Amino acid sequence: MPDNNSDPAVSMASRALGNPWAGFILALVVIVLDQYTKMWASNELVYRVPVEITSWFDLMLAHNTGAAFSFLASAGGWQRWFLAAVAMLVSVFVAVWLTRLEQQQRILGVSLGLILGGGLGNLIDRVTLGYVVDFISWHYQNWYWPAFNIADSAIFCGAILLLWDSFSSERGESA
């Protein structure tokens, strides 16, 4: 049966996304963007002083010694290496998973690439600085979402795609 997709650019992009190594390239892009934006935030923002962008969005430099939502942040220091070890183990697991993907598992490859890049971006901070640099702050009136960064956003988007892929795979859809 002839290929109905006659656009070579679309076909090439589809093949590239279907390549399991594309996940590693995406992870590298996430790491570079994450580290660049954290470096910018650390150089340009004053610690804990918000810069209002809109009525619901600020840039504010914060240092998170804990995990997501500052979990374990006040644990006394032991959490740095514990969380680094957990991040390293998860990263190895995700990297191995990426190498075992099949050509048609595009969404799964993207999700794992986002998760790997985000995890490694935060791991770099945790190991080199002892904390993770956060700088994106959303709020509504006096309710504030915990500050986060590009790596956190990549992990979140990757987790959503992972869930979507698992549910669409259960229904027998090809992702």
Kindly give the residue locations of the regions a language model identified.
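Alpha-helical transmembrane bundles and membrane-interface segments of multipass inner-membrane proteins
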Residues: 1-175
